[in-house]
Amino acid sequence: MQETFKHAEACWQCGTPAEEDLFCRYCNSLQPPALDYFRFFGLEPRLKLDPEDLQKRYYRLSRLLHPDRYTQKTAREREYSLEATAILNDAYRTLRDPIARAEYVLKREGFESVEPRSKNVDPELLEEVFELNMALEELRSGNEAARPQLEVARDKFLAMRSEIDRDLQDLFEEYDATGSREILERIRRLLDRRRYVQNLVAEVERELAN
C-alpha cells in the first residue's frame, strides 16, 4: 500500500524530485499532507470501499504520523505531522460512512449541496408530513392518544430511509463502474430525499422521548 500526498516539485528537505509519497524516498522526510481524502489514503475515488482495508490503512497511517514520532525531528516535520493527523481523522470519519462519503464525492466533483426542502419532495410524502405535523401538535398539547400514530409514522419513515439506502447502494455501484455524472445527479437527489426523511425521523423520535 502506497500512501499518497499532494505533489510538490521537490522534497522540501533534500531537494530531490518529489514523488507522491508520504515520505521522501531519498531522505525519508515527511512531506506536506494531501488534502484530498481519497488520495490521502492512497485510494481511487470510489463510492464503495472495503471497510476493513480502509481501517487497516487508517491504523497504519496513525502509527506513521503520530506526533510522538516527530519530537526529535525538524519543526517543519512536527508541523506536517500535526496537520496530517488532523486530516487523517477527518478523512477516516468521512470515508468510513457511506452517506458522508457520497456527500464528499459530490462536493469533490463540483455538485452543490442541496438542503432538504419540501419543494423537492413528492406530493404523496408531503401529505404524510402534513398528517405527521398534526399528530405532533396533538402530542405537544398533551394528547397521548397521538403517540401510537407517531410510532407508526416513525416506523414508516425508517422503512423509507432503508429503501433509499438500498437504492443508493445500487447507484454507488453504477457510478463506480461508469463514472457518470448523470448517476451522481441521481445520487444527489436521493441524498436530498434521505436528509428530508431523516429530519422527520429525528423530529418524531425527539417528541416521543419527551
What residues fall within each predicted segment?
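C-terminal accessory/regulatory regions appended to core domains
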Residues: 1-210
